[in-house]
C-alpha cells in the first residue's frame, strides 16, 4: 500500500466500508467527515440502498447535492430511499444528535459538487437553496427570528428538497408524487418542496398536482398540449421564469381575453431568457409577443407558428431579438421574393448567434444564395440546420464552400438536393444511390477545405 497516496488510502477505506455493510452502518456516526462524500458517491454508484438511507440521516454537512451523479431508471429506488430517510423532523429522542442536513438537492447538475464549501460554521449556506418561496429556509428563518426575538419558543426546523419534475401521467411519476406528499405530511409543514424545472404533458390532467407545488420556485416551465387558458392560470403563480416552452397549445383567438392575459404574464417575466412557442399560431401577431419580452432573451424557438413576411420584418427590427444565441424558425414557409428582412436579422445577430435552424422553410436556390453573405458574417455560429428545403446540388456546394470559412461551425444539417428525388420530398421517391454520391462529394469538399472537424449530416425520411 502506498502510504504517500492519500486518495488511494481514501478509496481503500471506502471500499472496505462498502464490503462490510453491517459494520459500516454501525460506524457511520463515528467515521471522519472527509470520508462521507466519497462514501456517498461510491454507495450510490454501487447501489447500496441501506447505506445511502443511513448516510442521509447522519450527513455531516448543511446540504447534499446530487450534482454530477448520473441517475438511471434502476437507481430511482435509491432516490426514493433517500427521500424517505431525509430527516424532516427533530429527533424524538432528546439524546440524539440533531441532523445537520437541511437541503437535499436531487437535481442533476454537472457544474456543482456534492456539497457546498463551508464558509461559516455558525451560518451555513448553500448556493442552491431556494430564494423565492415564502416557505424557503431563508424566508422562514428570517420570520422566526423576528417572531421569536426575546422568546424561548422552539420553532420547527425548516428543510428543503430540491427536485425537477416531469408530470407525464406514468406510474413512476404517480408513485414519486405520493412519496413527496407523504413526506410533506410527515414534516408537519417544515419541508419545502422546491421544483425548479417543471415539465407537463397534458396540462388538464395535472391540476391537482400543481396545487401542492409552490410555483414561485419554478424557473423552467414546459407544457406539451394544453389550453392557453389553463396555462395562463398556472403562469399567474409564477414570477421568476427563465425558460418557457409551450407545445401544441390551443386557444380561440389572438384578439381574445385569454391571449391578452397571456401577454400580460409574459410582460412580468423580467428574467426570461428562453422562449419556445411550437405549433403556436402567431401569423401577423409576432410583434405583440416580442414587444412584451425582456431584452435579455438568448434563445427563441418559433417552429410551426405560420409566421408571415410581416412577422419576419418585425423580427429584424425587434430589440428583444437582437442578441439571440439560438434562433429556430423551422417549418415556417419563406417563399417570398424579398429576403432582405431575414438578411437584416442575421446581420443583427452576427455577433451573438451560435445556433440557427431554418429546416422545412421552402427556401429555394435564389433565397439560399442570397443568405450566404449574411451567414458567413455570423462568426460565432456552431450549429446550422437548413434541412428539407428545395436546394439544387450546385447551390448546396456553394453553401458548403462558403461555410467552411466559419471556424466555429461544427455541425451542419443540410437538405438532400432535389435531383435525388423523383418527385421532391415525396415519401419513397428518394434515390439513395444519388444521395450516396452527394455525400461522397461533400466529404471530398470538406477534405479539400481541411475541415474534417465539420460534421455535415442530413435526414432521410
What are these regions (language model features)?
Residues 2, 76, 85-89, 119-130, ...:
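C-terminal capping region of solenoid repeat domains
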Residues 42, 47-141:
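Death-fold interaction domains
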Residues 95-301:
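Alpha-solenoid helical-repeat scaffolds
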Residues 23, 101, 218, 241-244, ...:
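Conserved hydrophobic position(s) of the canonical leucine-rich repeat
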Residues 1-40, 44:
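N-terminal alpha-helical scaffolding segments that mark the starts
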Residues 119, 210-214, 232-240, 255-270, ...:
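A structural signal for leucine-rich repeat
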Residues 19-23, 33, 48, 111-114, ...:
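Short, solvent-exposed loop/turn at the beta-strand->alpha-helix junction
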Residues 197, 220-225, 248, 274-279, ...:
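Structural position within Leucine-Rich Repeats
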Amino acid at each position: 500500500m502506498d502510504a504517500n497516496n492519500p486518495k488511494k488510502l481514501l478509496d481503500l477505506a471506502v471500499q472496505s466500508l462498502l464490503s462490510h455493510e453491517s459494520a459500516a452502518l454501525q460506524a457511520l456516526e463515528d467515521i471522519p467527515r472527509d470520508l462521507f462524500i466519497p462514501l456517498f458517491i461510491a454507495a450510490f454508484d454501487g447501489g447500496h440502498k441501506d447505506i445511502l438511507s443511513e448516510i442521509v440521516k447522519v450527513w455531516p454537512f448543511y446540504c447534499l447535492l446530487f450534482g454530477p451523479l448520473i441517475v438511471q431508471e434502476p437507481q430511482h429506488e435509491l432516490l426514493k430511499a433517500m427521500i424517505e430517510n431525509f430527516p424532516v423532523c427533530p429527533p424524538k429522542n432528546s439524546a440524539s444528535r440533531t441532523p445537520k442536513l437541511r437541503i437535499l438537492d436531487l437535481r442533476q447538475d454537472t457544474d456543482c459538487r456534492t456539497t457546498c464549501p463551508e464558509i461559516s460554521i455558525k451560518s451555513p449556506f448553500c448556493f442552491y437553496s431556494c430564494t423565492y418561496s415564502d416557505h424557503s429556509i431563508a424566508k422562514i428563518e428570517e420570520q422566526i427570528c423576528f417572531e421569536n426575538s426575546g422568546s424561548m419558543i422552539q420553532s420547527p426546523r425548516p428543510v428543503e428538497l430540491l427536485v425537477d419534475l416531469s408530470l407525464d401521467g406514468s406510474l413512476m411519476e404517480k408513485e414519486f408524487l405520493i412519496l413527496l406528499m407523504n413526506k410533506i405530511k410527515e414534516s408537519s409543514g417544515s419541508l419545502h418542496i422546491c421544483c425548479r424545472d417543471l415539465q407537463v404533458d397534458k396540462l388538464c390532467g395535472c391540476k391537482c398536482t400543481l396545487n401542492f407545488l409552490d410555483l414561485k420556485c419554478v424557473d423552467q416551465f414546459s407544457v406539451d398540449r394544453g389550453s392557453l387558458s389553463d396555462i395562463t392560470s398556472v403562469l399567474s403563480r409564477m414570477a421568476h421564469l427563465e425558460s418557457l416552452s409551450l407545445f401544441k397549445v390551443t386557444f380561440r383567438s389572438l384578439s381574445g381575453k385569454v391571449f391578452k392575459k397571456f401577454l400580460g404574464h409574459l410582460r412580468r417575466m423580467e428574467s426570461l431568457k428562453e422562449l419556445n412557442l411550437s405549433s403556436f399560431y402567431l401569423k401577423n401577431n409576432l410583434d405583440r409577443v416580442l414587444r412584451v419580452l425582456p431584452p435579455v432573451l438568448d434563445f427563441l424557438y418559433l417552429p410551426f407558428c405560420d409566421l408571415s413576411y410581416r412577422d419576419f420584418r418585425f423580427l429584424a427590427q425587434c430589440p428583444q431579438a437582437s442578441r439571440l444565441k439560438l434562433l429556430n424558425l423551422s417549418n415556417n414557409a419563406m417563399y417570398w421574393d424579398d429576403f432582405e428582412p431575414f438578411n437584416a436579422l442575421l446581420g443583427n445577430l452576427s455577433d451573438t448567434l451560435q445556433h440557427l435552424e431554418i429546416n422545412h422553410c421552402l427556401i429555394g436556390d435564389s433565397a439560399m444564395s442570397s443568405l450566404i453573405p449574411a451567414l458567413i458574417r455570423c462568426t460565432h455560429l456552431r450549429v446550422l440546420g437548413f434541412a428539407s428545403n428545395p436546394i439544387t446540388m450546385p447551390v448546396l456546394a456553394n453553401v458548403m464552400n462558403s461555410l467552411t470559412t466559419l471556424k466555429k461551425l461544427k455541425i451542419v444539417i443540410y437538405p438532400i438536393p432535389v435531383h435525388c428525388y423523383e418527385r421532391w420530398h415525396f415519401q419513397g421517391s428518394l434515390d439513395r444511390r444519388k444521395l450516396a454520391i452527394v455525400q461522397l462529394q461533400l466529404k471530398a469538399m470538406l477534405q479539400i477545405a481541411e475541415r474534417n472537424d465539420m460534421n455535415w449530416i442530413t435526414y432521410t425520411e
